Amino acid sequence: MNYPLTLDMGSITYNMDDLYKELAFYSNSTEIPLQDSNFCSTVEGPLLTSFKAVFMPVAYSLIFLLGMMGNILVLVILERHRHTRSSTETFLFHLAVADLLLVFILPFAVAEGSVGWVLGTFLCKTVIALHKINFYCSSLLLACIAVDRYLAIVHAVHAYRRRRLLSIHITCTAIWLAGFLFALPELLFAKVGQPHNNDSLPQCTFSQENEAETRAWFTSRFLYHIGGFLLPMLVMGWCYVGVVHRLLQAQRRPQRQKAVRVAILVTSIFFLCWSPYHIVIFLDTLERLKAVNSSCELSGYLSVAITLCEFLGLAHCCLNPMLYTFAGVKFRSDLSRLLTKLGCAGPASLCQLFPNWRKSSLSESENATSLTTF
């Protein structure tokens, strides 16, 4: 079929060459910013749509239930030992609070994936900011745990208990304040937007309608990469290499070796859950900066990868309680007593469900001095 080379609308006739020139003018204009990703929004295809509409509600609901119950149990058990808990357990208490914040935003993520964002700008800003606060606080708390273990084991720093607890509480307060400050760009610039194609659902996104907002978005992205992930992971890696090296030399202190294992495992789980998301987000940042060859196909693949990797990262909020349950002897003992007191389960049924509980608890719980002891 041969298409006409002109468009006749009443008394106005547009030549196709003139139309192309007008489009080129508007695409180069600074008054009407256009993003290439708007023209690639349909590349995702039905796979991502099905994932958001079918798999995401089921999976996120499961994560919500497990994360809610698990982290509340962690908080209850740690709160019962408030006056005797160690510095690591204090950091883990705040980590559980941060994970609960992440759990609370999961229903909003499910709703947005199914029907779009229909809850207004205020909740849009709040949910995106809570997501960022959770991540920053989690990574900074894990870095503090690594530094605390490094100072206690490698340099044998043992401060006076009251002064030490005060410094830990001040550190945790500073971490929450830092998480809030790092999330300020989201609080200021997040808004509900309608994608270019009218068939798409409204989304809660970081607004990039002008140059100032775009610069704020890139600043937030690089702060997320460097301050929220890269630097804390470097600190954790440096500290735990030193800790492991010292523990290998002190083979006569098996209890100390067991006590630090939970911190390394928690950090490893955090890295495994969030590193794929950060790698994909970093590639997306490079693609938006035109540092790599951009195409609709690449944008589509990155969009799918971001959604899948974000799901893995969000699943992290329900994994820490499981880790404490299956690895911490004292934690298992306290959990067993709590569930028995609540009438949820008795010691016999728990031992049948987890055969290794009774054996490990009898042999090691008497020597356990910390909830995070293995």
From Swiss-Prot:
Gene3D superfamilies membership: Rhodopsin 7-helix transmembrane proteins
Show the disulfide pairing. C124-C204
Q: Which InterPro entries match?
A: CCR1-9-like, Chemokine_CXCR5, GPCR_Rhodpsn, GPCR_Rhodpsn_7TM
Q: What is one cellular component GO term in this UniProt entry?
A: external side of plasma membrane
Q: Which residues lie on this side of the membrane: Extracellular?
A: 1-57, 112-126, 191-221, 283-306
Q: How does it sit in the membrane?
A: Multi-pass membrane protein
The parts of the chain that form a coiled coil are none
Its annotated compartments are: Cell membrane
Which parts pass through the membrane?
58-78, 91-111, 127-147, 170-190, 222-242, 262-282, 307-327
Task: Tell whether Transmembrane is among the UniProt keywords.
Answer: yes
Q: Which residue intervals are topologically Cytoplasmic?
A: 79-90, 148-169, 243-261, 328-374
What start and end residues bound the annotated signal peptide? none
Q: Give the UniProt tissue specificity note.
A: Mainly in spleen, in resting B-cells.
Q: Which UniProt keywords apply?
A: B-cell activation, Cell membrane, Disulfide bond, G-protein coupled receptor, Glycoprotein, Membrane, Receptor, Transducer, Transmembrane, Transmembrane helix
Query: Which Pfam families did the record assign?
Result: 7tm_1
Give me the glycosylation sites of this protein.
N28, N198
Q: Which family does it belong to?
A: Belongs to the G-protein coupled receptor 1 family.
Name this polypeptide is given: C-X-C chemokine receptor type 5
Name of the gene encoding the protein in the UniProt record: Cxcr5
